Amino acid sequence: MKLLIFSCLVTLALARPDALRLSIDRHFKHRELENRLNEDPIPVSEASSSEESVHQLNRDRRPLEKYELDKYREDLKTSSSEEFVTPSTNERVRRQVEYNFNEEDSSASRERKIEDFSEHDRQYLRRRVEERALNLRYLEPLYYATEPEYYYYYAYVPVSSHDIPYQQKPLSLLPAKSHYLISTGLLNEPLPILRERLGRGFQSPSLLILVLTENSNLFMGSVFYWCLQIAHPMQEI
């Protein structure tokens, strides 16, 4: 048993040598404090007027823990009293000037942020409009009919007659009706719907023919209907 206790102490000394040293130092401090308390107290008249001598005298007369607690309380009272000291006139003016300066700076920065956000929104809306116009310019030829498609699909059309039921005639020999396109609203028709309606018109006795003129610089500009009525009056497509 003694060997076990001795081995534990040796292990503790090797692992934590400061633990044994602290216990020894604490023992010496308590012994020194008891010796001082047993001595005769030093009269206050023998102490000097300096603050260090007063603290040293109090330290000799009172225990260490109580002295530290009292000193902490005195420091706390001193710091709290210093905080509640009324500032002078110059100090108040300086604080007011700093506050006004900070307030003006914050308001100016807030206005700059608002202007930056507004400019960002305007640029975003402007960019959206430009992108939409660009996309529309690229997508319109894909959705609406163009001049090469009309010439490719409607270069020759069948024409009904009393003698011959159907025959082929070139577009240059057919009369033009330019106002009919705008009146019927087929100028804005998409290409698939226009093909379907013209496909039904080719099978009817009354025939309407869609072509483009030579001066077609604008998109879907100068579009004409060529209509030919030989056996029946003109019918809607």
From Swiss-Prot:
One of its GO terms (cellular component) is extracellular space. Residues 39-60 are annotated as: Disordered. Mammary gland specific. Secreted in milk. Keywords: Milk protein, Phosphoprotein, Secreted, Signal. Belongs to the alpha-casein family. The keyword Cytoplasm does not apply. Induction: Maximal induction is dependent upon prolactin insulin and cortisol. The lineage of its organism: Eukaryota, Metazoa, Chordata, Craniata, Vertebrata. It comes from Notamacropus eugenii. Transmembrane segments: none annotated. Residues 1-15 form the signal peptide. Important role in the capacity of milk to transport calcium phosphate. It is found in: Secreted. This is Alpha-S1-casein.
